[in-house]
């Protein structure tokens, strides 16, 4: 079971995809407000039996961004940070999994950053595509297949530049 906050296009897509793998519940649905609003903690309908709570940290299409980290009372927190991962300091210890497509602000399209707690890496469902099997990716040092070398190179240059400028803290 999983809880999802629907606050824009990308969280809605993630919600629909997750339904292919198990029971998914809507913890918040902003569609009636044209996704113009990020819910307060009190507006979230979180379930203690959820395996995780998923939210999209920033909604570029609708111009909304979460300005707080949702409190889940021990339920694993998962976030799509594709468009804002390098815009502020993130306490990754509060998350079970963070993922971010690099194409928004880190590198050309083709690279996805995944930060996952080791204890969450387990045997995937039989229907999980191999490219989404984190256990395989970890065992193969993220090189199960030929990686997008130029994109990774550009990501490295961007991260070096960011570090030389003092990191996210200094930006």
Regions inferred by a protein language model and the residue ranges of each:
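Structural motif
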Residues: 3, 52-56, 78, 99, ...
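Short acidic/polar capping segments at secondary-structure boundaries
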Residues: 9-10, 29-33, 57-62, 82-85, ...
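Active-site-proximal loop->helix
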Residues: 13-23
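Conserved active-site segment immediately N-terminal to the catalytic lysine
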Residues: 78, 92-103
């Amino acid at each position: 079971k999983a809880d999802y906050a629907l606050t824009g296009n990308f969280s809605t897509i993630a919600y629909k995809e997750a339904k292919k793998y198990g029971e998914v519940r809507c913890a918040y649905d902003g569609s009636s407000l044209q996704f113009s609003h990020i819910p307060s903690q009190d507006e979230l309908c979180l379930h203690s039996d959820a395996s995780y709570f998923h939210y999209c940290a920033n909604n570029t299409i609708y111009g909304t961004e979460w300005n707080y980290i949702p409190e889940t009372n021990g339920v694993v927190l998962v976030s799509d940070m594709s468009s804002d991962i390098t815009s502020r300091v993130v306490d990754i210890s509060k998350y079970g999994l963070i993922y971010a497509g690099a194409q928004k602000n880190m590198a050309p399209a083709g690279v996805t950053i995944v930060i996952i707690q080791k204890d969450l890496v387990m045997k995937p469902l039989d229907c999980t595509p191999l490219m989404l099997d984190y256990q395989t990716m970890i065992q193969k040092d993220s090189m199960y297949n030929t990686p997008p070398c130029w994109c990774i190179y550009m990501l490295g240059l961007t991260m070096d530049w960011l570090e030389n400028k003092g990191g996210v803290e200094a930006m």
